């Protein structure tokens, strides 16, 4: 959309991140600097509201594997038009949650400029020319120190949590 020669399209910034790398903090700073909203876990609340599922369902399935390759390319670009089609009704719950999150991400991107942390938002918005994708990486030692400090746990425990989270995220995304 253009207004008076100025591009008025919503700008969307997606932030993928390694656990403990500071991705959420980068997202918060970016959103504050640009004066736009940040979506992270808040996206789960919105998806629950939009879909009619309770919020706990989204929290329990948040960034959990669904036998991915980005969940079979979002279920072959989900030939389910709307949520009333028979294939959707027969789908396992974790698949419905995955689709509901994607739909919410797309709705938010249409509505407003924002920063979205995680939730495969880069893939959900891959066809959006006004989407800028960022990935935050940090050395393992830095991540261990961050997680240890943020969760008030030992560095060994932090390393274990990072390894587990990295595996979960990899199977969710890949």
Q: What function would you assign to each model-found segment?
A:
Residues 1-7:
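Short, Lys/Arg-enriched N-terminal segments with co-localized hydrophobic residues
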Residues 9-12:
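Extreme N-terminal starter segment of soluble prokaryotic enzymes
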Residues 15-28:
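Glycine-rich phosphate-binding P-loop
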Residues 37-48:
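Short beta-strand-centered segment that lines the nucleotide-binding/catalytic pocket of NTP-utilizing
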Residues 67-74, 78-79, 154-174:
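Small-molecule kinase domains that catalyze NTP-dependent phosphoryl transfer to phosphate-bearing small molecules
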Residues 127-150, 155, 160-163:
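Conserved phosphate-donor/acceptor-positioning beta-strand/loop module used by diverse small-molecule
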């Amino acid at each position: 959309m253009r207004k008076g020669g100025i591009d008025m399209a919503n700008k969307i910034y997606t932030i993928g991140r390694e656990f403990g790398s500071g991705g959420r903090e980068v997202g918060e700073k970016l959103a504050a600097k640009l004066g736009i909203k940040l979506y992270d876990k808040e996206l789960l609340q919105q998806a629950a509201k939009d879909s009619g599922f309770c919020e706990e369902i989204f929290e329990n399935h948040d960034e959990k594997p669904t036998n991915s390759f980005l969940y079979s390319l979002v279920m072959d670009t989900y030939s389910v038009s709307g949520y009333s089609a028979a294939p959707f009704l027969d789908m396992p719950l974790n698949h419905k949650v995955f689709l509901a999150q994607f739909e919410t991400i797309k709705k938010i991107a249409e509505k407003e400029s924002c920063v979205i942390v995680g939730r495969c938002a880069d893939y959900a918005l891959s066809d959006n020319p006004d989407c800028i994708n960022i990935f935050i990486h940090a050395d393992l030692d830095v991540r261990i120190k961050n997680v240890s400090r943020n969760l008030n746990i030992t560095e060994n425990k932090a390393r274990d949590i990072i390894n587990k989270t990295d595996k979960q995220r990899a199977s969710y995304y890949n």
